[in-house]
């Protein structure tokens, strides 16, 4: 069960408290684990920072940040969770959010392949992947700039700040 005392994120067109609550309810694992709400909030913080700096679609990035791990079945190896998240996102378009075909294609790609280690793609997809990878400190891994996609995420200041948030489990 989610600790309701957690601070809520800054809202936007996409990030509403109702949508965050929905994502939390859809997630079937413990939110105190490695892939729960606190992780999503750090990824959201990273994603917003990167999207602004890199000129990526904030709408797609915010959706990715909230949806990317909602379909996990376990905390360990779950190679299909990204594909399940992408399919799930398709079912929610027009219900919880509205994105056009181009935005949906970017979101689908970002969700489907976010755990596969790719570094090439549209800048919005790259921002999504880096937002998640910058939070690897939570599992004892310091992100390597060679495995990141964007210039902003590779900068020592951004990389170090994200790593400190992740190892100290600061929600955002």
Task: Give the predicted meaning of each segment.
Residues 43-47, 80-96:
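An active-site-proximal "capping" alpha-helix that borders the catalytic cofactor pocket
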Residues 37, 41, 62, 101-112:
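Short, well-structured alpha-helical segments
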Residues 1-14, 18, 28-56, 67, ...:
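Divalent metal-dependent phosphate-bond-processing catalytic cores, especially two-metal-ion Mg2+/Mn2+ enzymes
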Residues 58-76, 81, 85, 108-115, ...:
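His-Asp-centered metal-binding catalytic motifs of divalent-metal-dependent phosphohydrolases/nucleases
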Residues 33, 75, 79, 97:
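Short gly/ser-rich anion-binding loops that grip negatively charged ligand groups
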Residues 79, 83, 101, 105, ...:
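Short, amphipathic alpha-helical segments
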């Amino acid at each position: 069960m989610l600790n309701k005392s957690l601070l809520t994120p800054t809202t936007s067109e996409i990030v509403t408290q109702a949508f965050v609550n929905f994502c939390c309810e859809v997630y079937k694992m413990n939110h105190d684990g490695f892939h729960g709400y606190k992780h999503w909030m750090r990824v959201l913080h990273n994603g917003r920072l990167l999207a602004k700096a890199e000129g990526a679609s904030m709408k797609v990035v915010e959706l990715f940040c909230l949806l990317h791990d909602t379909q996990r079945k376990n905390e360990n190896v779950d190679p299909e969770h990204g594909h399940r998240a992408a399919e799930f996102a398709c079912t929610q378009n027009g219900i919880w959010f509205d994105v056009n075909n181009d935005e949906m294609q970017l979101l689908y790609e970002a969700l489907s392949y976010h755990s596969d280690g790719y570094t090439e793609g549209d800048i919005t997809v790259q921002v999504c992947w880096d937002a998640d990878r910058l939070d690897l400190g939570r599992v004892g891994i310091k992100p390597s700039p060679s495995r990141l996609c964007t210039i902003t995420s590779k900068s020592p200041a951004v990389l170090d700040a994200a790593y400190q948030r992740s190892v100290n489990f600061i929600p955002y």
